[in-house]
Amino acid sequence: DTMIASFLTDHTPTIIPAADTPAAQLTVAQTDWSMRLSAPMSAELKDVLAPTLETYKLSITHLNNFLDVSRGGPQNFLLNNLLRFPSAKSPAASYGTAIHASLQQLHNLLRADHRLPPTERILNYFRTSLEAQYLPPDDFALYLDKGTAALTAFLDAKSSDFHDTELAELDFAHQGVVVGGARLTGKLDVADIDKHNKTIFVTDYKTGKPSHSWKGTSDYEKIKLHKYRQQLMFYQLLVKSSRDYGNFTFAGARLQFVEPDMKTGDILSLEDTFSREELAEFARLIGVVWRKITALELPDISGYSADYRGMVQFEEDLLTEVE
């Protein structure tokens, strides 16, 4: 017999046709879970989540997951970020982890030795980091070649742009950041900190296809860039509301793409600055989402299209709610 988690027993089971293929079985499972989690939240589920919410801090990844209606929005957030159901890490995500670890190592060595390490040393570190992801042999070979080529091109083009004042993986978990009533946390890939002039500039590394502008051409790219831009705003709020860096001037933020452009071979980056009004509105959005999360009042997104337009509309509707 199938055992149902006790906090889901209030949900009336829906009979779904049997599935014969793995793909069909996955679809059935996803549909069934979506229906269960879209039902009104039981008191027992709220009790299960209460200890988590007592110490919960909102990260930009969790915020993005809550807002992205193209990927399930609040229900996806509940399943993956609050209930923390296990999910397989994709080969692309494993590749991204290895690239980030390699660049973190570069910054750590530069900060310690005050000179750039040889490219070969970083490439060896990348291989070791990728091996630690335990990819299938074909995926490992594919991403080893891809990452080696990308890092070689990136380090060749950007070697003069690295500084020993840059701090990798600056963690704000214990900085006491509260924005819009929400406890926030996060790590900055790179923070260039000028203690004399009290300025801080943030760089976030991105793997994958680079973008030439903030506009985006496809719906997928528009959603991706929308999230990226919110990520940089989130980091500015983290810095300005933190214990140690609140009195620093936020000098700017950059998305630094690691992989070269397919057509030109150029290494691209996107920078942006945000107005006081834009940051205030984003902080208000964070506050609304925080209250939804902590009250476990997850909005029904069935009326929104699963695309960029639906995501923007969802955010606008959240902002219009009475605080």
Which residue ranges define each predicted feature?
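Generic recognition of stable, solvent-exposed alpha-helical segments in well-folded globular domains
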Residues: 2-6, 58-61, 73-77, 90, ...
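Active-site-adjacent bridging/hinge elements
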Residues: 69-79, 121-123, 199-213, 257
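C-terminal, charged and often intrinsically disordered regions of DNA end-processing helicases
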Residues: 3-109, 305-323
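A non-catalytic, helix-rich entry segment at domain boundaries
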Residues: 102-178, 267-277, 290, 314-323
